[in-house]
Amino acid sequence: MKKVIIIDASVSPSGSYTHLLLERFLATFQAKNKDVELSTWNLNELPVGQISYNTQNAGTFFSVENSDKYIDALKAAHGVIILAPMTNFNYPATLKNFIDHVFVANKTFKDKYVTKGASSGMLGNLKVVVLGSQGAPLGWYPWGDHVNSLRGLFGFAGVASFASVIIDGTKLLYKDKSKSEVVDMFAKQVDAIANEF
């Protein structure tokens, strides 16, 4: 049985571009993969998405409950689908908090300062798909490429299979279309990635 984890970092409870992309993705993926165990981690509701790393909690931040449990689940999973709309030119703060909890030396990557040689990732088992959106067209803010940043982070952790769909320019390009109509424009791209997942 394939274990697939949905990491929901969208601040919208439902009906957002990323949620609609997820619906399309799952419809295609599950049509070909009947034996799948889906888990959803809503980072708006879980402590792992709410607790940020700071001086007050530095000694207890990387706990079994908020780090190891999630790291073990990632290592046991076939794939991860991340809902990541752009927020202030980056992925949401809840996703940053999650990444801080699970990107741990010698658990998700071998730290070059601990072991001889360069760092190497320990999440090579994972396939990662990011479903993103942003108000501005791609390239308007090169320093704010949140999906490419996630590609780099997961690559560092050993993920070789990374794909993404990003609906960009939502504030400019699609004023006269419903969100569903916009998502339909990306259907072929979503389906192609879902079929390879």
Swiss-Prot record:
Its keywords, alphabetically, are: Flavoprotein, FMN, NAD, Oxidoreductase
Q: Does the keyword Metal-binding apply?
A: no
List positions binding FMN.
Answer: 10
Enzyme class, one word?
oxidoreductase
User: What chemistry does it catalyse, as a reaction equation?
Assistant: 2 a quinone + NADH + H(+) = 2 a 1,4-benzosemiquinone + NAD(+); N,N-dimethyl-1,4-phenylenediamine + anthranilate + 2 NAD(+) = 2-(4-dimethylaminophenyl)diazenylbenzoate + 2 NADH + 2 H(+)
Any note on cofactor binding? Answer: Binds 1 FMN per subunit.
Question: What Gene3D superfamilies has UniProt attached to this entry?
Answer: 3.40.50.360
Q: Name one Pfam family in it.
A: Flavodoxin_2
Question: Which Enzyme Commission numbers does its entry carry?
Answer: 1.6.5.-, 1.7.1.17
Q: Tell me its cofactors.
A: FMN
Q: GO MF terms on file?
A: electron transfer activity; FMN binding; oxidoreductase activity, acting on NAD(P)H as acceptor; oxidoreductase activity, acting on NAD(P)H, quinone or similar compound as acceptor
**Function of the molecule:** Quinone reductase that provides resistance to thiol-specific stress caused by electrophilic quinones.
The family this protein is said to belong to: Belongs to the azoreductase type 1 family.
What quaternary structure, including any partners, is listed in this protein's UniProt entry? Homodimer.
Q: What PANTHER family does this protein's entry cite?
A: FMN-DEPENDENT NADH-AZOREDUCTASE 1, FMN-DEPENDENT NADH:QUINONE OXIDOREDUCTASE
Q: Spell out the protein name for this chain.
A: FMN-dependent NADH:quinone oxidoreductase
Look up and give the organism this protein is from.
Mycoplasma pneumoniae (strain ATCC 29342 / M129 / Subtype 1)
